[in-house]
């Protein structure tokens, strides 16, 4: 065994490359981990769920310019009726479902699940409480959407604090749900110039501008089609001003009064002339992104009783808003910016319905009045009050604009404010366009690409302190997603109600360690345990593989985060499956290497055969993985789409890093002189085969000789015995069950339970991703591996369907946990990926190793397949247990409830993974190789096989002789 040690350039080069790759791998692991732990786009990891039921009016307005108000009595059925029924309620709810699925992701929420009810009678309870007028009820019910999601939640150490946190979580959920994103350009008193439902608005023109290399700023652009056919660069602004004039704004605050005339005077919000005595209006337009949401948010703040649990959850800004609305605290004085009290000394706002779409802007700010001319003369007696408006912030004076001012809350609802005109030198002079309108309608940026004839640009967004800041690409993209996924035009929220679903999870390490950090630590522990196990079992080979495994896992998460993915519970569940698949692939290659060694192959030859027998199968597996992920990305929404993105990234990193880097490292070392030293790879008992010589063998003619002499290592189980044929009946029964379950899912999925993801499209995306790629692989396998293999795969796939849907049904029946935290349809996709990877592993271990050569030489198939099953059961056992062990480690770091209680969600997760593992790793995979043998075209029931008694020279390592060596198929 001894080898002469010598240093050569080849040795130095290969060892040097190994060290460089290992260093780069370690650097990638450390740097990737650092980036992840400091990433701002971290989602929530099992941190508590809320369910919010939103009730919608099943009426719509006949006039597109008039909104329905659920707090007011519905119009009667006479000629003055302005409402009509929504006929397709289910289609209406489907559109809202899709809107929530995408917009909540853009807001940063995790684990969203959505259910619909076309006639929810629980709406009557809210109507009886006066939340909305009962005249809107239809048969004592309304259509509703129930949305469950997770959000960040801090720890509560006292019972009182827990109540406050519960209230805060519920209120945050309500605020998030009651958004109705719609782009709307309006006057300050609510007259709509156009909105995103206008037929002339080019909806698909919403674009987040990619920053130039010399500038990091972005912008939001969109196109509109004015009635004028030709708009030139020179006439651009005047044409838009003509468009404004066509809207009949004579009595609007835009043209008349002091800028807020509509809310001033006796019995109104502000005292007369609180905004000055100018008479030319304010010439200000407001670009809203969610005006209805702003109204609902302010109404909710107003309705909270002072000193109650909800009030205690207010931040300083919200407390200031509450004080302003009730004319209390610092807002009780007679300041012109504050509300004027009525005769009883109370706020003029007496009920939430007083806050409307027409007056909501004036809670936010007092518009700067407009002066016709810029100098004081006989034509402009108020010219001394002229205020220069150089930017959007100058268009108004915030009601509360300090560091804790409530006006900053409106940054969630207002995009921009635009002053259209500047004062002229004297009456009669041409209109002078304000700088904010010039920015909004940039004459140098009128490249029209979507069918409009005018292009608007918002380069600065309202910040959370009320100031204006340049738009970042991330924020512009987020706003674009929100506006592109608004409610249908006919949607009006009547009411909403929120409840907590389950106690949130905390970590088990320390109070100051976040849920994400503890989950990431769990991932690190998993990789460490895998490294130790691989290193002990496979020595240097295992350490190389462990490095590739760690780099692949961290790179998958890091790249996923870099492309905009939110690292949350779905990401960790997905990455654990990726790690499990990669571990199985590594173990398969390592065991195949040892198998070749035991078969009298040299170390170099053994590794060559490993590559030869695994290369194309690995490509096939990862291509299926990647293509299915792309289908899911294209057809799904929200976190299911994100999971598809993670799987697509992982397919690439797993092949090139987990498989590719591991192969390169081992090959470089094996091909060096040091690699010829067996002690780096093998224990003494495994290395004994390196000194054995091939024995003389022959294939005898008698069946008894074949059974007694050829297969010296007796099979522990005979799966083809007469008594075992009863198993065929069981398999056929399960096969029929799989067909039935598939039929039920396609025809009546509600009978199987609530297995859908956040929305129907996502569930459809998963099923198409699984079904289409499985069919393509089946068609591919027929010419590559033969009909027997293809039929075996098809049967195993149907058995898998029985297992997956059966596991979903049992999990739903046994645990009945909230689907928001664990969506079972997600596990259908993940376990299909796991199944597909195991098919590849089985193909490497059996078909590529045994079938081709053995069947070619007409080996007795009965004994061959018995030996296959007996040789693979340990790999099957490892494959079945790896996932369960991974989630047990995950649970060890994430089982403690914030309030000192144990949350069972994480243990349900372990049980569900175990349940799915049994169904996926049991019958489908077990039967795959066995059925392949049954369907073999060779007659294995004949009594005698006639072959020549001669020694055959094979071009590669003999795959039959290994059965002469005791213990070759064990490890």
UniProtKB/Swiss-Prot annotation:
It is found in: Cell membrane. SUPFAM superfamilies: Multidrug efflux transporter AcrB transmembrane domain. The chain crosses the membrane at residues 11-31, 516-536, 547-567, 569-589, 615-635, 651-671, 727-747, 763-783, 795-815, 817-837, 878-898, 900-920, 923-943. It is a multi-pass membrane protein. One of its GO terms (cellular component) is plasma membrane. Its main location: membrane. Keywords: Cell membrane, Membrane, Transmembrane, Transmembrane helix. It comes from the Bacteria. Signal peptide: none annotated. The keyword Transmembrane applies. This is Uncharacterized protein MG277 homolog. The lineage of its organism: Bacteria, Bacillati, Mycoplasmatota, Mycoplasmoidales, Mycoplasmoidaceae.
């Amino acid at each position: 065994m001894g080898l002469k040690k010598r240093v050569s350039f080849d040795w130095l080069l290969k060892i040097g490359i190994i060290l460089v790759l290992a260093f780069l791998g370690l650097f990638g692991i450390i740097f990737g981990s650092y980036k992840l732990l400091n990433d701002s786009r971290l989602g929530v990891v099992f941190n508590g769920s809320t369910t919010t039921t939103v009730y919608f009016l099943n009426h719509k307005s006949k006039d597109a310019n008039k909104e329905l108000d659920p707090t007011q009595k519905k119009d009667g059925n006479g000629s003055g009726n302005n409402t009509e029924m929504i006929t397709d309620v289910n289609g209406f709810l489907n559109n809202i479902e899709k809107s929530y699925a995408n917009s909540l992701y853009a807001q940063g929420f995790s684990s969203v699940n959505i259910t619909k009810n076309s006639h929810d009678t629980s709406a009557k309870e809210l109507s009886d409480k006066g939340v909305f007028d009962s005249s809107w009820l239809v048969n004592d019910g309304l259509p509703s959407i129930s949305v469950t999601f997770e959000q960040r939640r801090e720890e509560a150490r006292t019972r009182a604090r827990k109540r406050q946190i519960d209230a805060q979580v519920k209120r945050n959920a309500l605020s998030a749900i009651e958004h109705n994103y719609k782009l709307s350009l309006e006057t300050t008193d609510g007259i709509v110039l156009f909105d995103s439902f206008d037929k002339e608005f080019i909806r698909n023109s919403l674009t987040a501008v990619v920053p130039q290399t010399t500038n990091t700023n972005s912008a939001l652009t969109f196109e509109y089609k004015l009635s004028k056919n030709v708009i030139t660069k020179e006439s651009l602004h005047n044409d838009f001003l003509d468009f404004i004039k066509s809207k009949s704004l004579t009595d609007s605050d835009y043209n008349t009064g002091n800028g807020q005339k509509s809310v001033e005077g006796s019995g109104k919000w502000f005292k007369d002339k609180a905004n000055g005595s100018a008479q030319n209006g304010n010439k200000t337009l407001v670009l809203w992104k969610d005006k209805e949401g702003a109204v609902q948010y302010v109404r909710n703040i107003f309705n909270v009783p002072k000193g109650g649990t909800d009030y205690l959850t207010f931040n300083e800004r919200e407390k200031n808003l509450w004080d302003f609305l009730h004319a209390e605290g610092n807002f009780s004085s007679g300041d012109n910016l504050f509300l004027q009290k009525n005769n009883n000394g109370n706020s003029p706002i007496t009920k939430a319905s007083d806050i409307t779409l027409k007056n909501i802007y004036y809670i936010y700010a007092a518009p700067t009045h407009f002066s016709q001319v810029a100098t004081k003369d006989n034509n402009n007696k108020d010219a001394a009050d002229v205020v220069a408006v150089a930017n959007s912030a100058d268009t108004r004076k915030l009601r509360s604009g300090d560091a804790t001012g409530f006006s900053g809350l409106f940054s969630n609802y207002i995009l921009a404010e635009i002053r259209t005109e500047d004062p002229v030198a004297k009456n009669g002079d041409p209109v002078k366009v304000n700088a904010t309108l010039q920015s909004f309608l940039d004459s140098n940026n009128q490249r029209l690409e979507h069918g409009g004839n005018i292009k608007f640009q918002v380069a600065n967004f309202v910040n959370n302190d009320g100031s204006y800041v340049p738009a970042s690409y991330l924020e512009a993209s987020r706003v674009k997603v929100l506006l592109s996924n608004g409610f249908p035009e006919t949607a009006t929220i009547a009411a909403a109600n929120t409840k907590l679903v389950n106690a949130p999870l905390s970590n088990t390490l320390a109070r100051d360690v976040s849920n994400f950090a503890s989950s990431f630590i769990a991932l690190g522990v998993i990789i460490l345990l895998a490294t130790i196990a691989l290193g002990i079992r496979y020595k240097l080979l295992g350490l190389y593989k462990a490095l590739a495994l760690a780099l692949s896992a961290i790179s998958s998460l890091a790249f996923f985060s870099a492309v905009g993915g939110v690292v949350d519970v779905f990401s960790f569940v997905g990455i654990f499956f990726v790690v499990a698949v990669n571990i199985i692939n590594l173990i398969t290659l390592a065991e195949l290497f040892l198998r070749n060694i035991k078969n009298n192959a040299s170390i170099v030859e053994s590794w060559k055969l490993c590559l030869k027998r695994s290369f194309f199968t690995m490509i096939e597996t990862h291509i299926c993985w990647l293509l299915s992920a792309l289908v899911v990305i294209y057809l799904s929404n929200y976190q299911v789409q994100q999971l598809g993105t993670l799987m697509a990234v992982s397919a690439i990193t797993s092949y090139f890093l987990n498989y590719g880097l591991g192969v390169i490292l081992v090959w470089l070392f094996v091909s060096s002189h040091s690699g010829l030293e067996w002690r780096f790879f093998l224990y003494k008992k495994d290395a004994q085969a390196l000194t054995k010589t091939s024995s003389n063998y022959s294939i005898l003619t008698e069946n008894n000789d074949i059974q007694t002499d050829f297969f010296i290592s007796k099979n522990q189980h005979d799966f083809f015995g007469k008594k075992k044929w009863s198993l065929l009946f069981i398999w056929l029964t399960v096969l029929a069950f799989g067909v039935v379950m598939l039929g039920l899912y396609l025809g009546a999925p509600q009978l199987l339970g609530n297995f859908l993801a956040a929305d129907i499209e996502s569930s459809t995306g998963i099923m198409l991703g699984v079904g289409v790629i499985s069919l393509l692989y089946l068609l591919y396998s027929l010419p590559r591996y033969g009909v027997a293999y293809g039929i075996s795969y098809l049967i195993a796939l149907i058995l898998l369907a029985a297992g997956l849907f059966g596991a979903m049904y049992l999990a739903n029946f046994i645990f009945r946990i909230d689907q928001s935290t664990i969506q079972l349809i997600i596990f259908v996709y993940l376990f299909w990926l796991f199944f597909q990877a195991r098919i590849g592993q089985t193909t490497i271990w059996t078909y590529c190793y045994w079938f081709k050569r053995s069947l070619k030489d007409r080996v007795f198939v009965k004994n061959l397949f018995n030996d296959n099953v007996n040789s693979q059961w340990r790999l099957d056992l490892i494959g079945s247990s790896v996932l369960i062990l991974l989630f047990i480690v995950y649970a060890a770091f994430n089982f403690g409830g914030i309030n000192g209680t144990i949350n069972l969600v994480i243990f349900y997760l372990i049980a569900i993974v175990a349940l799915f593992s049994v169904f996926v790793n049991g019958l489908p995979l077990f039967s795959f190789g066995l059925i392949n043998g049954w369907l073999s075209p060779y007659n294995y029931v004949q009594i005698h096989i006639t072959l020549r008694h001669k020694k055959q020279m094979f071009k590669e390592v003999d795959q039959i002789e290994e059965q002469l060596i005791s213990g070759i198929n064990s490890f």
